[in-house]
Amino acid sequence: MDTRIKAVATASMYDMTVASRLGMDKETVQATKEKLSKQRWIDAQNGYPEYIPYFPDKPLEKVPEDLTEPTAEWFRFYALKRGHHINALGGFTTTSNLAFMNYHLLDYLDEISPRPILFIVGDRAHSKFFSEEAFNKASEPKELYVVDDAEHIDLYDKTDKIPFDKLELFFKNNFK
């Protein structure tokens, strides 16, 4: 932890280590690592990494009906005019998950203490468990702030949902 940091706040936090392994058993993890390792060789030979955009290059009028959650939620933001941008088509390089699968991002979460941490999450966020798990692992001082009637993406741009007053007070109190 960079000791210059005085306080940490997250909104709609995602633990990519956990997300990269969700639903996988040990054999599937190993097979995925094998596939991604081979792709790294291909990327090296090509001189650039493979990147497969997750969202369309032009905004859609509506979310495709066959999408399930949380994919439909991502599309409600990134694939529609609401959050679409030509330079933000989602996803990572094909091999990005290999790095996430090889270490746990929250292993040293306790080292943030004694600096305070504020976890902000929507009560309907599919990602809520990431913040709850991180909150449980974190040392004091810490706070889990739940925004009513909000899903993950609402904390990106819905100004009536983003708790600006809470964030302002948190940082004013901790940037002394």
Model feature map: region roles:
Residues 144-146:
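Conserved beta-strand scaffold positions in the cores of enzyme catalytic domains, especially
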Residues 112-113, 118-121:
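Short beta-strand/loop motif that positions the catalytic acidic residue
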Residues 124-142:
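Conserved loop-alpha-helix segment in the C-terminal half of the alpha/beta-hydrolase fold
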Residues 1-77:
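Alpha/beta-hydrolase-fold enzymes
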Residues 122-125, 149-151:
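Acidic beta-to-alpha connecting loop that harbors the catalytic carboxylate
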Residues 148-176:
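Catalytic active-site module of serine/aspartate enzymes centered on a nucleophile-bearing elbow/loop
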Residues 110-113, 137-139:
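Short, conserved loop/helix-junction motifs that constitute active-site signature segments
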Residues 17, 91-109, 126:
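Active-site nucleophile elbow and catalytic-triad environment of alpha/beta-hydrolase enzymes
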